[in-house]
């Protein structure tokens, strides 16, 4: 399981020309589910994401979490994080989980984030989405469990 976590001033998802979700200050998380990933791995990843201290405190040091700053969370499923371009120029996505299981874990990620008191929104699983963001910092982390 892989996640790209970006600290943002705002982020949004548009599908078929319609706004489906948007957040203000917080995290945009791109989530990639690999074959065989478990709920335990998802729990570990979400716990880590929500505990990250990547917002500045009063001295400018990265020391505050998403909850500390009252931030919001936008989670977008992105199977292309599991792409392998080590051979040739066209990536293989054979390492990505099958859609039904990936969707199940993605939806659990939304619930886990919301259950921790964080206003959480998502994209539309499997849709062609237009994701916009204003990266803050920029601060971008790649996490893998």
From Swiss-Prot:
Look up the signal peptide feature and give its range.
none
Q: Name one GO cellular component term.
A: cytoplasm
Residue ranges of the motif Gly-cisPro motif, important for rejection of L-amino acids: 137-138
Pfam families, sorted? Tyr_Deacylase
One GO process term, biological-process aspect: D-amino acid catabolic process
EC class (word): hydrolase
GO MF annotations in UniProt? D-tyrosyl-tRNA(Tyr) deacylase activity; Gly-tRNA(Ala) deacylase activity; Ser(Gly)-tRNA(Ala) hydrolase activity; tRNA binding
Subunit and partners: Homodimer.
Q: Which family does it belong to?
A: Belongs to the DTD family.
Query: Entry's PANTHER family?
Result: D-AMINOACYL-TRNA DEACYLASE 1 (PTHR10472:SF5), D-TYROSYL-TRNA TYR DEACYLASE (PTHR10472)
Protein name, per record: D-aminoacyl-tRNA deacylase
Q: Which organism is it from?
A: Bdellovibrio bacteriovorus (strain ATCC 15356 / DSM 50701 / NCIMB 9529 / HD100)
Q: What is the lineage of its organism?
A: Bacteria, Pseudomonadati, Bdellovibrionota, Bdellovibrionia, Bdellovibrionales
